[in-house]
Amino acid sequence: MASSFKSPADTAKACVGVAALKEKAPLSNLIVLSFVAGAYIAFGGLLAEVATGGMAAAGWPTGLVKLVFGGVFPVGLMLVVIAGSELFTGNCMYMPMGILQGEASVMGTIKNWVGSWVFNLVGALFVAYVLAYLTGILTAEPWAATAVTIAKTKALGGAQFIAAGKTVTSLSWMQVFWRAIGCNWLVCLAVYLAVASDDVIGKSFGIWFPIMAFVCIGFEHVVANMFFIPVGIFIGGVTWSQFFINNMIPATLGNIVGGAIFVGCIYWFTYLRGTNKAKA
């Protein structure tokens, strides 16, 4: 019986092939597929907030709340990978592998990263404003309080605030950066496992476990935060400057390091070094 998954070496080659396709993709495809990728990740975030709204205030153990949150969130990346789209964090793995193997260029990578980041933001904002805020899904209690607490924790830059009668300390800039490295290490491993599998069930399992892990641990995903924090802005409690300065910048930088170095470069070095060709 034929194997339903690729070897690690063949998976690395397949990732380079994906990078080559992304290098050649028209700008219109990049824009549309990046928009839907941001929306898909936001769907996962919306589901997670709806599923866990009020659990902490009701006295549920913190670890169990995180497990439920992380258990439902992976639907977002399943949609991204299986339906097909352009996710900035996954591209942080693909494109450096393409560069190192000579199948992608630096300028093509910059275009891909900037385009996917910007339109991931547009897609996530659409879901946050239209499907989470205007619909009233996250504006009623207990979901509103949960959404605002999550946004403040991510965006207040180390400041303290009161949530459910308790003092909470938000993440500092450097904490977001380090957590973002761990996040995209796991996210890109999820993508890598999905590439390794040749069937939908295998891809789904390959995605679910690493994504559940990063969410439960509390790592920082820049595209997910393009949903979580703006919801808090729309409801009230966080500003746009706090969103960009205290989270988007460190989360973006950390996600690049986590995906490019700890997954892309490591697997290229392990399986593909010495087989590359030059590309301008």
Curated annotation (Swiss-Prot):
Pfam families this protein is in?
A: Form_Nir_trans
One MF term in the entry's GO annotations = high-affinity secondary active nitrite transmembrane transporter activity
The transmembrane segments are 33-49, 67-83, 116-133, 177-195, 204-219, 253-272
- Topology with respect to the bilayer: Multi-pass membrane protein
Recorded superkingdom: Archaea
Q: Where is the signal peptide?
A: none
Query: What GO cellular-component annotations does this UniProt entry give?
Result: plasma membrane
**Alphabetical list of InterPro entries matching this protein:** Aquaporin-like, For/NO2_transpt, For/NO2_transpt_CS
Provide the protein's localization.
Cell membrane
Q: Any keyword Calcium?
A: no
**Function comment:** May act as a formate transporter.
What's the family?
Belongs to the FNT transporter (TC 1.A.16) family.
The identity of this protein, by name, is Probable formate transporter
What organism does the record attribute this protein to? Answer: Methanobacterium formicicum
Report which gene this protein is encoded by: fdhC
